Structures are given as C-alpha cells and as structure tokens.
Amino acid sequence: MIDTTLPLTDIHRHLDGNIRPQTILELGRQYNISLPAQSLETLIPHVQVIANEPDLVSFLTKLDWGVKVLASLDACRRVAFENIEDAARNGLHYVELRFSPGYMAMAHQLPVAGVVEAVIDGVREGCRTFGVQAKLIGIMSRTFGEAACQQELEAFLAHRDQITALDLAGDELGFPGSLFLSHFNRARDAGWHITVHAGEAAGPESIWQAIRELGAERIGHGVKAIEDRALMDFLAEQQIGIESCLTSNIQTSTVAELAAHPLKTFLEHGIRASINTDDPGVQGVDIIHEYTVAAPAAGLSREQIRQAQINGLEMAFLSAEEKRALREKVAAK
C-alpha cells in the first residue's frame, strides 16, 4: 500500500514517545534506576499499550517510563539518534520529530535548554549516519502549566534556527489553547511554523481556537472536526492539514474502532490529511503498519492511501525547493 516511487514521511511522531523498550532497560541498568520489570518481555506491558487505554491521559502515562530513564544529556542524545535509526529502518525519507524538553528533563532535573541541544545533536548525527532527512518540532507540554511551557519556549528560542515549528500537546481538556496565546505570538515572531494538538480529547471548538488564536497551519489528530461541517469546509478551503494517527486514536479511545475513523471522510472532503504514527515505541507500531494494516482497516482505498502519502509531503514544513528535491531523489532510486 506504500507507493515506493513517492517520498514516505511521518510528520506527527513524538521523539519522547519512541524510546525503545530495550533502551529503557539498558538505561535503567546504566543509571541504577528501578524499573517495574527486569527483562524485556516483562517490561513491555509497562511501556507499551497492550490493550486500548480508557482515555488520552491514561495513554500518556505509558510514556513515563521512557523519560524516567533519561538521567543524563547523553541519554537524551542516544534516544534522539535511535529515533533516526528507527525512521531509516522503516524506510522513511523524511520525518518531523517533536519533543517536549521539559517532560524529558523532569525526572532528573536536567537543564531544559541542555535537553534541546542534546536532541539536536543526536538527530543531526543520526541523519548523517542513516541518510534520513529530519526536522524538529518543539512541544510545549500544556499538562504542566503555563510557566513550564514558558521555560520550554525559552529553551527552543535559544536554538531557534534548529527548530522548525512549535506545538502544544498534553491535556487538551484541562489546559485549553487560550492559556498560551502569548507563547504562540512569540513563536510566530521567531518565524516558526505552527501545529497544534486539537480535536483529540476536546471538540471542534478546540480546532477553531488553534487556527484562529494560535495560528495553526496544521492540526494534530483533529478527529473531532468530523462533528463540524463548516470546520471541514474551512480546513479543505484553507489547506490546513490534519496529521492523522490511526492506531493511536484507537488506543486512546478517541475513536472506537478503525472502521469509524474519520480519515476517509476527511480525504473525501478534500481535506489535506496524512498518515502518521504518533508514539510508535509506546504503541508497538510503525509507519508500515499504519499504511498496510490500519489504513485499509479504516476503509481507505488504495488511491486514498496514495493521496494521504502525497499529502504527507505537501503538508511537511519544507520549502517548495526541499519538497521538489526529495521527490526527485526518491524517483531516481
């Protein structure tokens, strides 16, 4: 179902949601951190979703063990490097990795700006080693409040040329976008793109707010757009992309089953929507699974899957020249 003549992208992928279980085990031993299990087989149920979680917040707790072992900046650098290696193994040509440095720093009080620098270094080295093209999206974790998000923003601004976009993720219901208007004003002033997690736990009004008040050019998940025909029309007309994450939306109980996922409807409506993983390490999936298993189960035709693959590059935070070069590079292989 993947068209090998086209670039394969993953533009909604959390670096801190893709820490390998084996790496969690090894870092736990290296830094003498107590883990809930001592073998890979017994650790996996604690760090991967085995059965669907009742809600988004429950799902997010599965990510916690991955960041609890980030006891040094070297550990952060390692997981960033491994993220690129995983992308290469999946056959991805281009990946946008998003990460929350405050979340990664929290367990061991690491310097937030230092985490940003370590991630930049690890990703850069991974791209050099594996030949994958990558850009970084900075996440503000709304769950930890406005002040913590301000600290993350300052850390990103200290490395503004290595950050492509700003995102807001976490507890959408408890911490609405209206709390972060000044943060996004500064992000736009820095020349960054804007993508926002919206319409995942909250309704279509959260998507409207992300677009109108925060300046979102893309929406992460956005499943609740299906409830508002005017919003769907607006997304299609303005070419505001939806970063769909099929398996993730089932595992968080945002959508009951793949057959009920709105991605097919979005594509039929002319909305620029793409297929992405979200937190592949926690979900136990990869981009190949999303294209070959999840997308057909969500009712997408072969042509719709191909369109979603095209959309992934069209939506990417790349210049027209960068997109053209990537298309030509893949076509020449």
Swiss-Prot record:
Zn(2+) binds at residues 12, 14, 197, 278. SUPFAM superfamilies: Metallo-dependent hydrolases. The keyword Metal-binding applies. The keyword Hydrolase applies. Substrate binds at residues 14, 16, 170, 279. One of its GO terms (cellular component) is cytosol. GO terms for molecular function: 2'-deoxyadenosine deaminase activity; adenosine deaminase activity; zinc ion binding. CDD domains: ADA. Gene3D superfamilies: Metal-dependent hydrolases. Its EC number is 3.5.4.4. HAMAP family: A_deaminase (MF_00540). This is Adenosine deaminase. The lineage of its organism: Bacteria, Pseudomonadati, Pseudomonadota, Gammaproteobacteria, Enterobacterales. The gene is add.
